[in-house]
Swiss-Prot record:
Gene Ontology cellular component annotations, sorted alphabetically: cytoplasm
Cited PANTHER family: MITOCHONDRIAL RIBOSOME RECYCLING FACTOR PSEUDO 1, RIBOSOME RECYCLING FACTOR
Location relative to the cell: Cytoplasm
Protein name: Ribosome-recycling factor
Family of this protein: Belongs to the RRF family.
Gene symbol of the encoding locus: frr
């Protein structure tokens, strides 16, 4: 039963890491990356549809994204969705494909994005600490209900703390990696 608490916490830690990686992918680093467009939804025949389901997205050059719609009739809708998004990138429509040229980041923009990375990373650490608290509460509840002994509780708390420390260290390394990517010219 005690291992179930740790396994559940580790599973939730992994979900937090995946979520953080997705959020970091959406922060542009001056290089083209298809994940920049993950959050864009297109109004297609009256239904909001993710862009990656309406078109293939390729990276032909370091700072260019090429969007090839499966249905050429949707190209105007895709262009409108990109213009309305908060990407700050103007699409170039040539009738059959849309080109997005990712502008080089200024030093000021890089620093702002690095701050955003730290903020997002800090939120992930808060989520990790909340998961730890939930696991600790569950362990104390089991000890209170005499399902485990006090010694088992202490061991379990140490194991939960070690798993938490590992999860936080992974977040720190993810933050450092993304900051390095952003600040490298």
């Amino acid at each position: 039963m005690t291992n179930a608490i740790i396994e559940k916490a580790k599973e939730r830690f992994a979900h937090t890491h995946e979520s953080l990686a997705r959020e970091f992918g959406a922060i542009r680093a001056g290089r083209a990356n298809a994940s920049l467009l993950d959050r864009i939804t297109v109004e297609y025949y009256g239904a909001p549809t993710p862009l990656n389901q309406l078109a293939s997205i390729t990276v032909p050059e370091a700072r260019v994204l090429l969007i090839s719609p499966f249905d050429k009739g949707s190209i105007a809708d895709i262009e409108r969705a990109i213009n309305e998004s908060d990407l700050g990138i103007n699409p170039a429509n040539d009738g059959s494909v849309i080109r997005l040229v990712i502008p080089a980041l200024t030093e000021e923009t890089r620093k702002e994005l690095a701050k955003e990375v730290k903020k997002v990373g800090e939120n992930a650490k808060i989520a990790i600490r909340n998961i730890r608290r939930d696991a600790m509460d569950e362990a104390k509840k089991q000890e209170k209900e005499k399902e485990i002994t006090e010694d088992q509780l202490k061991t379990l708390e140490k194991d939960i703390q070690k798993a938490t420390d590992d999860a936080v260290n992974k977040i720190d390394s993810m933050i450092a990696e993304k900051e390095k990517e952003l600040l490298t010219v």
